[in-house]
Each structure stands twice: as C-alpha cells, then as structure tokens.
Amino acid sequence: RVTQQNAFHNTLKLFFYGLLSLVPGKAEVPLYFVTGRFVVEAIAELTQHCEPQSIVHVCHSQDETPTLGELLDLAYDRFSEEEDFRVRNILRPLFCDEESFSLLAGEAEDMGATVMSQSLGSIAPFAKELFTVKDIKNDRFRAALKNYRAPDPKVLLDAVCGHLLKTRWGKRAG
C-alpha cells in the first residue's frame, strides 16, 4: 500500500499517461529505494543495537537493488496489463544523455507552464543522479539488524504499480 507519494510515484504516473517519452540516465544505474515501513522499523531496531552517533546507511546493497532499466521494464510490463494503457500504444521511454535532457528541460521551462515543462521539471531535480552508479555499503546496517532481509524488488514494484493503478495515483478509493 502506498501511503505517501513522492517523485518516484509521480514519475511512474507520467510514464503511465504517456507524458514521459525520454528518461535521463543510464539503464545500469542502481536505484536504492526503500519503503517507509522498512525505514521506520530499521530505525527503531537501530536505536536498540547501534552505538550512539554511529552512521548507518539504511538501504539495501547494490546486488539487492534494481537498476533504472529494470524498473522501467517492470513498470512497463505491469502497465501493459491495463487496457487503457495498451490502447494508447505508449512506447517505453528512451534513455537520453545528461546534456540532452538538461537542454530539453531548460527549453521546456522557457516555454512556460506546459504539460511537458511540468513533467520534465518534476524529474530534473534528481536527473543527475540517474547517470551515476553508486555502490552504497550497508555492512554495518546488516550487522546491526537481527532479521535483515531485502524485499524482492520485482514483487515490491509490482505491488506499488498495482496500488497506483487501482487508485489511479490516489484519485480512486483503494
């Protein structure tokens, strides 16, 4: 269940409605997503088992983390199960380089408040991150939690997409 939507959910919405034909980034970049519940439970447990003032990365390891390309493929496959997505013949978004995306977003912003400028503007703040492969180490985090287990990212994304589709991003009862 999605209780609070953020940039990730908004990006999926743009994708579903065909407003995102270009995606900044590289397919192989890992995206370190965690659920709110996971973070709350982890912090609660960390307060009991960690040294005071220690720094811990509350995230999954790179090998437990889906890439941008995998997430787009999973979302596209899930959206393709919906009749209203299929009938619009929406194509998978294409990856574009950082310079091209910046130029496009800047030109769209100069055109004023259009659907395109709004959709690109919602992605622009984190676009640079989608070009950088980061390998975040969570060894201390894993050691501190008794029952650490990363969720299956495919199952998680399918559930998120399913909820967003069912509620149409919060516009319908879930």
Where are these regions (language model features)?
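Short secondary-structure boundary/capping segments
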Residues: 1-8, 71-77
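Short, flexible helix-coil linker/hinge segments at the edges of structured domains or between repeats
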Residues: 3-12, 114-118
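Residue-level signal for the nucleotide or nucleotide-sugar donor/cofactor binding architecture
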Residues: 3-6, 31-37, 66, 136
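A conserved pocket-lining segment of Rossmann-fold NAD(P)-dependent short-chain dehydrogenase/reductase
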Residues: 9-38, 42-46, 57-59
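Glycine- and acidic
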Residues: 20-32, 53-59, 122-126, 142-148, ...
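Non-catalytic, hydrophobic alpha-helical segments
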Residues: 39, 43, 58, 71, ...
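Mid/C-terminal beta-alpha module of Rossmann-like enzyme folds, strongest
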Residues: 46-124, 164, 171
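Amphipathic terminal alpha-helices
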Residues: 85, 91, 127, 131-174
